[in-house]
Amino acid sequence: MAKGKFERTKPHVNVGTIGHVDHGKTTLTAAITTVLSNKFGGEARGYDQIDAAPEEKARGITINTSHVEYETETRHYAHVDCPGHADYVKNMITGAAQMDGAILVVSAADGPMPQTREHILLSRQVGVPYIIVFLNKADMVDDAELLELVEMEVRELLSKYDFPGDDTPIVKGSAKLALEGDKGELGEQAILSLAQALDTYIPTPERAVDGAFLMPVEDVFSISGRGTVVTGRIERGVVKVGEEIEIVGIKPTVKTTCTGVEMFRKLLDQGQAGDNVGILLRGTKREDVERGQVLAKPGSINPHTDFTAEVYILSKEEGGRHTPFFNGYRPQFYFRTTDVTGTIDLPADKEMVLPGDNVSMTVKLLAPIAMEEGLRFAIREGGRTVGAGVVAKIIK
């Protein structure tokens, strides 16, 4: 029975469970929804409902993901849980489910395992900013020293991948006990401690409208007597009539002024994140702007050609390549609205990449693109997507 109606007034935060197979991610997800729905309202979701993750497509890649929501006293959370390891890899690289923070589930009985490490590394590569740890199955460990040892191992592993291991909140508990209604320290109490850690350790994310203005250029028109109009959807920030903006990417950066904002054929004083607008630019010729560039607040973003990336290569079944590729492979990289050719440099220990693999690589583009760490892109060959990636580190 719902306790009162669901209010959307609380700040919204996106989280998800990560960790090794069978360490209890899905059980924990079910336990969180159950305990919090009893306390703050919302819908309890059983293990089976979450485990039967529906298939969805992100950038042509098939991913199984379960979405649940729950709330605490101060926030509303959207939470993703994936059934299989491959789904996590795809989810994190495509950004299908952006996470403001992740709950790393580690079985106290087993300690960190290969996928524990891999999910922490992926979180670092794709820019998940915060990790909280739930040491699950703590009821199965009688030895307090052993628990401490596992906790130390997890902290060391986090620090190794540049997360603040020493300051990371670690909650010990048993998702299974909590799900079964146990009110004890390892049951319901542990879930409430975890909820409190989420509320306090993960800051409220900046809303898109509060960021620095950025709009990918989709189309450019010349309107006689008025000048050049650039259309697109504002990704973040606000642009006001009369403000100076930069055109960034592909060619050298130039400054111009926004002399008008138009939406649905009406003139506005400003456009903001989420709006599909036409922006009138002063003294800019039609041939000065092209699809693939961005309009941005001056100094807020720079064009780059060289970067490292974390990439997932589509399997043959997903419509990807049927054969591996090797060092020096030159596909197109699709950033925001356009393709740019680039050359791939593989790590020394990687001779080739097979369809269905995920890999770290260095990329050199033929033309610079307005770029920052965390930017998503697709890898294409002749117009079809063969991979998805995220910029891990900018080189130049």
From Swiss-Prot:
Residues 10-206 form the tr-type G domain. Pfam families: GTP_EFTU (PF00009), GTP_EFTU_D2 (PF03144), GTP_EFTU_D3 (PF03143). NCBIfam families: EF-Tu (TIGR00485), PRK00049.1 (NF000766), PRK12735.1 (NF009372), PRK12736.1 (NF009373), small_GTP (TIGR00231). The keyword GTP-binding applies. Residues 19-26 are annotated as: G1. PROSITE patterns: G_TR_1 (PS00301), G_TR_2 (PS51722). Residues 174-176 are annotated as: G5. Gene3D superfamilies: P-loop containing nucleotide triphosphate hydrolases (3.40.50.300), Translation factors (2.40.30.10). Keywords: Cytoplasm, Elongation factor, GTP-binding, Hydrolase, Magnesium, Metal-binding, Nucleotide-binding, Protein biosynthesis. It comes from the Bacteria. Mg(2+) binds at T26. Residues 81-84 are annotated as: G3. GTP binds at residues 19-26, 81-85, 136-139. This is Elongation factor Tu. Residues 136-139 are annotated as: G4. The keyword Metal-binding applies.
